[in-house]
C-alpha cells in the first residue's frame, strides 16, 4: 500500500497533536491507496491461509455434529425407545388383569345373589304372600330396571328373566365404562407420545437447519462472508496499515472480530466529544479536508476496539480512538486516530524535584585525624616571612 502525503493533511495532523496539563495527545490522519506491493501480496497470502484454516475447522465441526445427531435417529427413535414400549406393555398387562378380576367379581356376585334370593324367598314373603323382589347389586340403575322393579314389587312377583336381564344390563354398563376409561387412557398416552415425538423432531430439525447452513453464511466479523475475496481484502488492508504504522508490533493475533462497523455520524460525534473533554475546540475544516481526499459519503467506517490493545505495552499509555475509513470507489483507506498518554514530567515528578533541589558538599569523616593538630602557620618556624624577603631584595 502506498502512503499519500498531502500538505493540507499535514495541517490536520498538526492540529491533532497537542498537550494538556497532564496528558499528551498524538493524533493523525494517514491516507493509503489499496494498490498492493510485493510485501502486501505476501501478507494477503498469509491472511488467506489463516482464514482458510478457520473455515476448514468450522466445516469439520459441523460434520462431526451432524454425525452425532444422525446416530441416535438411526439407532433409536423417541417413540421406539424401551421406556415407551415398557410403558405400553405394562399398561396393557394391568388393564387385562383389571378386566379379568372385574369379570370374576361380577360372576361371584351373580352367584351369591341367586343363592341369596332363593333362601330369602323361602324365609320371607311379601304382603300378598308372594316372595319379595331382591334388588341386584349394580353400580347404576337405568330406567328399564327401575320400571321392572316397581312393577314386580306391586304385583308381588318377579321373574327370573327380569333378574337375568337386569344383571346383563349392569354388566354391559360396566363393560362400556371400563372400555371408555381404557380407551381414554390409551388415547392420552398416545397423545403424550406423539407430542414428545414431535417436540424432539422439531429440535432435531432446528439443529439440522443450523448445521446445514452453507459456509458462505459464516461471517467474517464486520467484513462479511468469510469465503468472499472482497471481505478478506478489506481485512488485509487494515492489517497492512497497522503493520506500516507500527513496525515494532506484531499483529498476527488480530482477529476480524476485533473490528466493529459503525456509522460515520457516530464516529465523528465520538471524535469531537473526545476533543471537547480534552479542552480543544473541534475544527470544521478538518473534516472538510478529509472529505476532499476520501469522500466521506462513500466510505465505510471500521473502528478498532480489541479486548487488549497493542498499545498497552507503551509507557504511559491511557486510551485510544482508532478508526479506518474505506472508500472502495477511490481505492483508499484513511487511518484516523487519537492516542492519549501521560506526560513525561508527571511520571518523573519525584526525580525532577530531587534534581532541582540544591545539594551541599559531602564530607566523609572516618575519625583518622582525630588526634592530629591543625596547621597553624602563625607559630610555624618554617613559615616564610614575605616582608623580610622584600627587604633583602631591596638591599
From Swiss-Prot:
Its main location: cytoplasm. GO terms for cellular component: cytoplasm; nucleolus; nucleus. Residues 69-84 have a biased composition (Polar residues). The modification Phosphothreonine is found at residue 347. Residues 106-131, 152-166, 178-197 have a biased composition (Low complexity). The keyword Cell inner membrane does not apply. Belongs to the MAF1 family. This is Repressor of RNA polymerase III transcription MAF1. The lineage of its organism: Eukaryota, Fungi, Dikarya, Ascomycota, Saccharomycotina.
Amino acid at each position: 500500500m502506498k502512503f499519500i502525503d498531502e500538505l493540507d493533511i499535514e495541517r490536520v495532523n498538526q492540529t491533532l497533536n497537542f498537550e494538556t496539563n497532564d496528558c499528551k495527545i498524538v493524533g493523525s490522519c494517514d491516507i493509503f491507496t489499496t494498490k498492493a506491493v510485493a510485501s502486501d501480496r505476501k501478507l494477503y497470502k498469509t491472511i488467506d491461509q489463516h482464514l482458510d484454516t478457520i473455515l476448514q475447522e468450522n466445516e469439520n465441526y459441523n460434520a462431526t455434529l451432524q454425525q452425532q445427531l444422525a446416530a441416535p435417529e438411526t439407532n433409536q427413535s423417541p417413540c421406539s425407545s424401551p421406556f415407551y414400549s415398557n410403558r405400553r406393555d405394562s399398561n396393557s398387562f394391568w388393564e387385562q388383569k383389571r378386566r379379568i378380576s372385574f369379570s370374576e367379581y361380577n360372576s361371584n356376585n351373580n352367584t351369591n345373589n341367586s343363592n341369596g334370593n332363593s333362601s330369602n324367598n323361602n324365609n320371607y314373603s311379601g304382603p300378598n304372600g308372594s316372595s319379595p323382589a331382591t334388588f341386584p347389586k349394580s353400580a347404576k340403575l337405568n330406567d328399564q330396571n327401575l320400571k321392572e322393579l316397581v312393577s314386580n314389587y306391586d304385583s308381588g312377583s318377579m321373574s327370573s328373566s327380569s333378574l337375568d336381564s337386569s344383571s346383563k344390563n349392569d354388566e354391559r354398563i360396566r363393560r362400556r365404562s371400563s372400555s371408555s376409561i381404557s380407551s381414554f387412557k390409551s388415547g392420552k398416552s398416545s397423545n403424550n407420545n406423539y407430542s414428545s415425538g414431535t417436540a424432539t423432531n422439531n429440535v432435531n430439525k432446528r439443529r439440522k437447519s443450523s448445521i446445514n447452513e452453507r459456509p458462505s453464511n459464516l461471517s467474517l466479523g464486520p467484513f462479511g462472508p468469510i469465503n468472499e475475496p472482497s471481505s478478506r481484502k478489506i481485512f488485509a488492508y487494515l492489517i497492512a496499515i497497522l503493520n506500516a504504522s507500527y513496525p515494532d508490533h506484531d499483529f498476527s493475533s488480530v482477529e476480524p472480530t476485533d473490528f466493529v462497523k459503525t456509522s460515520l455520524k457516530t464516529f465523528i460525534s465520538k471524535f469531537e466529544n473526545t476533543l471537547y473533554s480534552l479542552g480543544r475546540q473541534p475544527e470544521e475544516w478538518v473534516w472538510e479536508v478529509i472529505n476532499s481526499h476520501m469522500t466521506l459519503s462513500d466510505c465505510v467506517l471500521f473502528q478498532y476496539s480489541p479486548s487488549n490493545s497493542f498499545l498497552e505495552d507503551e509507557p504511559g499509555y491511557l486510551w485510544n480512538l482508532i478508526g479506518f475509513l474505506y472508500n472502495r470507489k477511490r481505492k483508499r483507506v484513511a487511518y484516523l486516530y487519537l492516542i492519549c498518554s501521560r506526560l513525561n514530567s508527571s511520571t518523573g515528578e519525584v526525580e525532577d524535584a530531587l534534581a532541582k533541589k540544591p545539594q551541599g558538599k559531602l564530607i566523609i569523616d572516618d575519625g583518622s585525624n582525630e588526634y592530629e593538630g591543625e596547621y597553624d602557620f602563625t607559630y610555624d618556624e618554617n613559615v616564610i616571612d614575605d616582608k623580610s624577603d622584600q627587604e633583602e631584595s631591596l638591599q
